Amino acid sequence: MNGFYVGTWERPKGTADRLTYDTRWIQSDTGRPLSLSLPFGHAHRGDGAQTLRGDKVAAYFENLIPDNERILQRLRDRYGARSTTPFDLLAAIGRDCVGAIQLLPAGTEPGDIRHIEATSLNEAGVANVLRNTTLSRHPGEAPDDDAFRLSIAGAQEKTALLRHRGRWCIPHGATPSTHIFKLPLGLVGNVQADMRMSVELEWLCMELVREYGLPVAHVEIGRFEDQKALILERFDRVRARDGHYWLRIPQEDFCQVTGLPPNRKYESDGGPGIRRIMDILRGSENADADRENFFRTQLLFWIMGATDGHAKNFSLTLLPGGRYRRTPLYDILSTLPIHSRGANRMDPHKARLAMAVESGNRHYLIHDIHRWHWVGMAESLGLADRVAAVIEDLIERTPRALDALAKRLPEDFPTELFDTVANGMTAAVKRLAREPDRRSVASVRKR
């Protein structure tokens, strides 16, 4: 981690994954566990080190790789990994992961992070990197021996580059990437929903969230020859104090926090929901702000029709001494532009939030969630004195946020995309404004 030896990850044949923390790391001023689910205190002491074993160790590392089998197979072929298992893949591509760790074969030196090693790219070079992102190695070709081997979790096609001295670069050795490039999604899911404009849509959603005053990653739309990408500035990277090199910032997503594999990222599949995450955020350095903003984000996702707010799309920054706080938001996509019936569309009555709103029963369907559900859940989470202000603030901010963003859309931004999202959000807040805080007896009988 930033040149410091943390420990070893092993997968002995026939036994559980094993993580051994080095004592020097544990005792260091900068030392911290890799995850809240893998604390120092729960490790078994022995031979000057501490060891953890089991499913939580395996889950932590599995969450560092993409959770898309097609992407995993392509990475295996491209880099000559033995298999698509997390251990074999990360042995090949674990030099630049989400967060701060670098995974290297035993005995390999990590390199000097204080010295930037990179190959500068022109526009054609960046375009070529983006084109090659989705390509596998052809039969008979040698594995890609580029020294920069990165692993970015998630289900979307993406790559990463370094921004150095005003130019895009391929980093090498210990030098980290600073920006993630996300390619258009295309047709996605079982219904093959048309998300070919996902780059513009995600930019729109991220900038809308910024207009509401919530912490969110900086994004821009990049075009390089015939290639287009959403460029996200990494908040797990920061310049060193002297400004001459980059440091990696430890972080983990909420699947890692809770020790769960990525196939349980949705609450309906056994992942953490709003209540579990709100409980964890009680231990944050910024507990009050982090908890209120997390609840506010869930309500805003309902307004936006953003259905992918699962456990991997919320993260913590890990600080020395076991301290932590929430990271900025990222990976926000509204489904409003595809709400209709027909080919490549999503039935709006089937649109579900990733985390249930609990108020008596558990509610996932967006159309079935009402103001009184949000109020009831907020009260059960200890936000009774804040929920009315949060709801009214979102109602009042929505027209201002939409107007402000409309004035700074890029020149070639598709106006119909903005209008669809704006109309859907406006309808949602009007409904929120007219509904009561308490469900009436008449509505109970009606249902």
Please annotate each region the language model reported.
Residues 1-447:
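Phosphate/dinucleotide-binding and metal-coordinating scaffold of catalytic cores
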